[in-house]
């Protein structure tokens, strides 16, 4: 992993200052849907309303505003409470997570501004400096410069980015264009939620933490570019609502259903063991409850794997609905990048938003 060269200041356990961890502190999907139900029908304001290609009504990863026939702005924001104890790693993870929404839409980040909340007393500002440097390091890796930001006094530390990117409006990847026959490819392993929960409790092995941090700080840039070149038009990134929750949103928007083969889903090292030991976040429990009635999990799927399918992820991979003819070559390209990409299922005709999870692919 890349390192931040600035001298580190002794820090308390940052995860002890947070009631949640990473994207597990998101408002639960059920509450978010309730909130936005009251906003449906509100008109987009201003003369550019007709050029708003993706907005709140679509529930996608980012907003998209067309500038002209060849350029569209992609705007997103994401921030969260500490997910790890190392300040620079937290900054790097939060930045990669925020940038991911631009990649999920098929865009490239241009610039960002910091969003930070920090206690006015009791936590050294030098620690926030390490967080910001970590975020700037990953943004620079993405070719995205950080142009200032905003801070507030808050007893619970929070950090993230508001990101502006650029995309071709004719080549956007959105959640509403998956079609039956598309092959579902996941580009990163899942399990960051159980690792973060165990870390917060001081029970995560160091090698497991290291693997999770490496995954969470890995940009989705290469995966996004490969997907665009393969002709993918339906995608999302897997974060706080878990794999099944984000798939459900894609399916509901696309008026389709899906099959998932649990044995094909890549898991982070140690994730199954931690799930089996009961390190399950409140966000994951909320995800599981929200998917009741939408996710039919075969009883033969191991209980810990079923948990991980709902596990609240932070800076997860892209979930791509790839055209059948393009899927094999796309999978090869992703694996050549060193990604643990896997074909985990397919889109099928069926009840909108529903997912059937089977133990393994039947030949």
Q: Where are these predicted regions, by residue range?
A:
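Glycine-rich anion-binding loops of enzyme active sites
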Residues: 68-84, 89-92, 108-205, 346, ...
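Small-aliphatic-rich amphipathic alpha-helix that forms the alpha element of a beta-alpha
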Residues: 87-113, 130-141, 219-234, 238, ...
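A generic local secondary-structure boundary/capping motif
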Residues: 52-54, 62-65, 100-103, 136, ...
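Active-site glycine-rich loop that binds ribose-phosphate moieties when present
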Residues: 162-172, 207-227, 301
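N-terminal glycine-rich phosphate/pyrophosphate-binding loops that anchor nucleotide-derived ligands
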Residues: 2-104, 144, 179-185, 189, ...
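Buried hydrophobic positions in well-ordered alpha/beta secondary-structure cores of metabolic enzymes
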Residues: 23, 64, 98, 106, ...
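Acidic-glycine-rich active-site phosphate/pyrophosphate-binding loop
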Residues: 63-74, 217-223, 288-299
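Glycine-/charge-enriched secondary-structure boundary and capping motifs
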Residues: 1-20, 31-35, 46, 50, ...
